[in-house]
């Protein structure tokens, strides 16, 4: 029966939206991480440390799942695999409703993350089979920011009345919806390339490692702060309703960062946009020290959100440019997830006594490290790009004909 359902055009905007939901289903808990961490504290009485570790286990599982799927992607039926992975996510979210001890929940959420990481990696491979995959990734970012902002804005308000299970029920509903959407996606066969050198022997490993390290540090800095952003706001005397609303709206405004990536593209290279974005992230993060002033709290959330979307897109794109076979793109995704997991874990050890000032200072140190690590690979890639452009310009006909 399912095979008789009409399929959307593989490269249409509708298909890109459906694919974005497929990828988001495996990682949506990250977009609502502040609601999840604060919900564990409010509903189950977890400490900052234990709530943060639950979130970290979730993302560490995703990193492991994404790592594994990279080796399996060419040997599996993506549609059948996606069905089973979505069913697995639903099962793990249902199991999370029954887990009440921190360590039981860490185990269940690690398993959930592992399954979700495989689904995200699978979805990313399908993105690469579309025409203009960058557009699909752009749609993905918009979907995640819009839904994540709405979730952070509304879900924390339901936790005091309905408990933590409202969050897991939301994740179940999202996976069920995605399972229905999956039926309308067309086939995306693997594109076999000939003559491509994929052994990685020509990749400048030191520059790549610096690029991957910058991704790791940047994601750790931002997610370490973002996971506890609700608690940070409340520690400065801000009301929960105000904190949730402003964080959610800031997430929506942060779409500007994603749109700027599309507009700017590579016309200014990598180095300048990354440095400018890092500077904005640094200033916004430092401003959280004055969160008792409401307009500064709002400005800090907006600026860091815009910078996060803007910079991470450039960092991932930078790593992907080191080869054309997609190997470095897989590794950058792995580094990203490791950073997203490590940030909340590191933060959880700092907040035993509610020391949010130390958390902010640590985020600033990590951002500085990310800036320095990204400078050399970005500059090197810009030099190569400029050299290629100069060569092409010198061989272009006076009429300026391009292929």
Protein language model features and the residues they cover:
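Cytoplasmic helix-loop-helix junction between adjacent transmembrane helices
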Residues: 108-143
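Helix-to-loop junctions at the C-terminal end of transmembrane segments
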Residues: 65-78, 257-270, 351
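Extracytoplasmic gate region of multi-pass secondary transporters
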Residues: 33-34, 207-248, 252-255
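Intracellular juxtamembrane helix-capping segments at the cytosolic ends
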Residues: 118-131, 309-323
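Helix-loop-helix hairpin linking two adjacent transmembrane segments in secondary transporters
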Residues: 104, 130-187
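Conserved MFS/SLC helix-loop-helix module at the cytosolic interface between two early adjacent transmembrane helices
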Residues: 64-101
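A late C-terminal transmembrane helix in Major Facilitator Superfamily
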Residues: 322-356
């Amino acid at each position: 029966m399912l095979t008789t359902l009409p399929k959307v055009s593989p490269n249409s905007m509708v298909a890109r939206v459906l694919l974005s939901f497929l990828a988001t289903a495996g990682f949506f808990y990250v977009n609502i991480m502040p609601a999840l961490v604060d919900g564990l504290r409010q509903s189950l009485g977890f400490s900052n440390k234990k709530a943060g570790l639950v979130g970290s286990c979730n993302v560490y599982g995703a990193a492991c799942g994404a790592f594994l799927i990279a080796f399996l992607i060419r040997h599996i039926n993506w549609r059948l695999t996606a069905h089973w992975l979505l069913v697995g996510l639903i099962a793990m979210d249902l199991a999370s409703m029954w887990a009440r001890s921190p360590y039981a929940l860490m185990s269940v959420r690690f398993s959930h993350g592992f399954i979700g990481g495989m689904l995200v990696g699978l979805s990313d491979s399908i993105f690469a089979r579309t025409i203009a995959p960058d557009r699909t990734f752009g749609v993905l970012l918009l979907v995640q920011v819009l839904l994540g902002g709405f979730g952070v804005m509304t879900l924390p308000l339901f936790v005091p009345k309905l408990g933590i299970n409202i969050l897991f029920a939301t994740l179940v509903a999202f996976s069920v919806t995605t399972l229905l959407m999956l039926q309308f996606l067309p086939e995306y066969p693997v594109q076999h390339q000939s003559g491509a050198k994929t052994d990685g022997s020509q990749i400048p490993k030191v520059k790549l490692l610096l690029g991957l390290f910058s991704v790791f540090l940047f994601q750790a800095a931002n997610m370490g702060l973002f996971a506890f952003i609700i608690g940070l706001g409340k520690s400065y005397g801000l009301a929960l309703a105000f904190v949730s609303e402003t964080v959610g709206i800031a997430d929506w405004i942060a779409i500007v960062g994603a749109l700027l990536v599309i507009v700017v593209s590579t016309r200014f290279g990598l180095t300048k946009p990354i440095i400018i974005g890092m500077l904005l992230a640094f200033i916004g993060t430092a401003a959280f020290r004055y969160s008792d002033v409401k307009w500064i709290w709002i400005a800090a959330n907006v600026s860091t959100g815009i910078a996060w979307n803007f910079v991470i897109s450039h960092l991932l794109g930078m790593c992907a440019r080191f080869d054309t076979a997609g190997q470095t793109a897989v590794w950058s995704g792995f580094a990203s997830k490791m950073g997203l997991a490590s940030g909340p874990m590191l933060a959880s050890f700092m907040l035993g006594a509610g020391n949010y000032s130390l958390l902010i200072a640590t985020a600033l140190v990590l951002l500085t490290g990310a800036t320095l690590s990204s400078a050399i690979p970005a500059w090197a890639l810009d030099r190569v790009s400029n050299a290629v452009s100069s060569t092409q310009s010198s061989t272009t006909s006076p009429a300026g004909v391009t292929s």
